[in-house]
C-alpha cells in the first residue's frame, strides 16, 4: 500500500531569509576534535601548520560557514592566554570539564588560521565560568582591535598584524548546568553576561553576542532561566542559545524519529519567551535564536566511562552514527529551516571525531559518517528563502508523541539561481509515500535531480566501509505545475527543481 501526502508551495508564502550560519558547526578542545582531528603534525596529508588537508577538504565539501570555538564545557575553565604566543612556552593544563590534559598547541590564532582555510567564520566563546568580564574584554581587544593597545600589540608580536575581526561571540556555555565550572543562577549569570557584553561591545561595537539559554529544555530552570537572563541582557545581546541532543536508547525507531517534534516545540517556546521579554521592555529589538549545539548523541556514553583520566586527546564522544541517525539529523535540519525567520545561527555539534560527521584515523584516512550527507545537502542546497509549505500527511502515534506526520519537509527558494529545493523525510517503516505537490507559481521548472539516502539496515554505519551513501535515482517528475514524487520508506530526499 502506498500512502499519499500533499503539499502546496507558493513563492509568495515565505517564512524568511535563511541565514547561512544555520549550517554552522562546532570544534571544542575535547577528545580528538582538535588533536588528531583537525590537527595532526606529521600526517601524510598534513599542511605546513600541521592541519590535515583531508579534513579541510571534507569541511569545505560541507560548506560550513561558521564554527563555534573553543567550547563547550571546556571554555568555562579555559585561560585563552595559554593558547597564544610561542608554542614552546605554552603551559599544559588540566581540563577539568573532560578530565584530560590540554597541551595548548592549538589556540586562538591557529584556529583562526584553520577557519580561513576551510572558509568559515569563527564563533568565539568567552569564559564566564572560572573567569569573567576582564578576560572577555581583553580577548575581544586581542582579536579585533587593529593596534596601539597592549592586547592588540601582543597579537601583532605573535605574528598577526591584521585583526581577526571575529563578529560572533558566545557569553559562556551552559551556565545553569551542575557539571559546569562556575555554575550560576539565572540572576548571577544574567548580571555577569550583561556586564561582559557591555564591555565587549565597548571594545568593538560591531560584534554580535549570544547569551546562554538553558543547557536543554528538560532543565528544571528552563523558561525561567531564559526570561531572567534576557531581562538582564536584552540591551546587549543579539541571540539566545539552545542546546539539544537526542538518542535511541530504547531502540524504538518510531519514537526516535518523532523527536524532531520536541526540537520544534523547544524552538517555539524560546521564541515565545524572547518575545515576552521584548513586550515587557517595550523594546523595538527582536532577539533571535542560536541553536549552537544540536545532534544525536548516545552511542559513546559507555565507552567514555572507560577512559583513563588526564590523558591527551583520548577518544571521547566518538559516536559511530547509523542510518537511522541520519534520518533524524535530516528531520532536525528541516526543523531549523521551518524556523528560518528566528533561528539565525545553528551549530551541528560537533565537526570532527567528537559526535561528528567527519571521523579520522591517526596517520590514516578521514571518512564520512552517515550524518555527513543530510548536513551537506542542506548546507549546499538550502540557501535562499524558506517557504511556508502547506503539508497534509498521514500521521502516527509513538510512545512519547501523538500526530507525528510521516512526511517531514521543508522548501527553499533560491530566486537568483531560479532553483527550488525540497528536503523530505519519509518516517514510515514499511510504506513509500506518494508526494503530490502543487508548484503552480514555479512555471517552467523541471526536476534537476532527486537525491535519496536509504538503506535496508537501520543500524548500518560507514565505519570500515561506506555502506550508507546517497544515490541520484529518485523517482520524481513535474507536469503542468504539479510535482509527483515517490519517497521510499525511511528515506531522506533532496528534490531539486530549476529552469536551467
Swiss-Prot record:
<keyword id="KW-0119">Carbohydrate metabolism</keyword>
<dbReference type="InterPro" id="IPR017853">
    <property type="entry name" value="Glycoside_hydrolase_SF"/>
</dbReference>
<dbReference type="InterPro" id="IPR013780">
    <property type="entry name" value="Glyco_hydro_b"/>
</dbReference>
<feature type="binding site">
    <location>
        <position position="173"/>
    </location>
    <ligand>
        <name>alpha-L-arabinofuranose</name>
    </ligand>
</feature>
<feature type="binding site">
    <location>
        <position position="245"/>
    </location>
    <ligand>
        <name>alpha-L-arabinofuranose</name>
    </ligand>
</feature>
<dbReference type="GO" id="GO:0046373">
    <property type="term" value="P:L-arabinose metabolic process"/>
</dbReference>
<comment type="subunit">
    <text>Homohexamer; trimer of dimers.</text>
</comment>
<feature type="binding site">
    <location>
        <position position="350"/>
    </location>
    <ligand>
        <name>alpha-L-arabinofuranose</name>
    </ligand>
</feature>
<comment type="pathway">
    <text>Glycan metabolism; L-arabinan degradation.</text>
</comment>
<dbReference type="GO" id="GO:0005737">
    <property type="term" value="C:cytoplasm"/>
</dbReference>
<keyword id="KW-0378">Hydrolase</keyword>
<feature type="site" description="Important for substrate recognition">
    <location>
        <position position="350"/>
    </location>
</feature>
<comment type="function">
    <text>Involved in the degradation of arabinan and is a key enzyme in the complete degradation of the plant cell wall. Catalyzes the cleavage of terminal alpha-(1-&gt;5)-arabinofuranosyl bonds in different hemicellulosic homopolysaccharides (branched and debranched arabinans).</text>
</comment>
<keyword id="KW-0963">Cytoplasm</keyword>
<feature type="active site" description="Proton donor/acceptor">
    <location>
        <position position="174"/>
    </location>
</feature>
<keyword id="KW-0326">Glycosidase</keyword>
<feature type="binding site">
    <location>
        <position position="28"/>
    </location>
    <ligand>
        <name>alpha-L-arabinofuranose</name>
    </ligand>
</feature>
<dbReference type="Pfam" id="PF06964">
    <property type="entry name" value="Alpha-L-AF_C"/>
</dbReference>
<feature type="site" description="Important for substrate recognition">
    <location>
        <position position="297"/>
    </location>
</feature>
<dbReference type="GO" id="GO:0046556">
    <property type="term" value="F:alpha-L-arabinofuranosidase activity"/>
</dbReference>
<feature type="binding site">
    <location>
        <position position="73"/>
    </location>
    <ligand>
        <name>alpha-L-arabinofuranose</name>
    </ligand>
</feature>
<dbReference type="GO" id="GO:0031222">
    <property type="term" value="P:arabinan catabolic process"/>
</dbReference>
<comment type="similarity">
    <text>Belongs to the glycosyl hydrolase 51 family.</text>
</comment>
<feature type="active site" description="Nucleophile">
    <location>
        <position position="293"/>
    </location>
</feature>
<feature type="binding site" description="covalent">
    <location>
        <position position="293"/>
    </location>
    <ligand>
        <name>alpha-L-arabinofuranose</name>
    </ligand>
</feature>
<protein>
    <recommendedName>
        <fullName>Intracellular exo-alpha-(1-&gt;5)-L-arabinofuranosidase</fullName>
        <ecNumber>3.2.1.55</ecNumber>
    </recommendedName>
</protein>
<dbReference type="InterPro" id="IPR010720">
    <property type="entry name" value="Alpha-L-AF_C"/>
</dbReference>
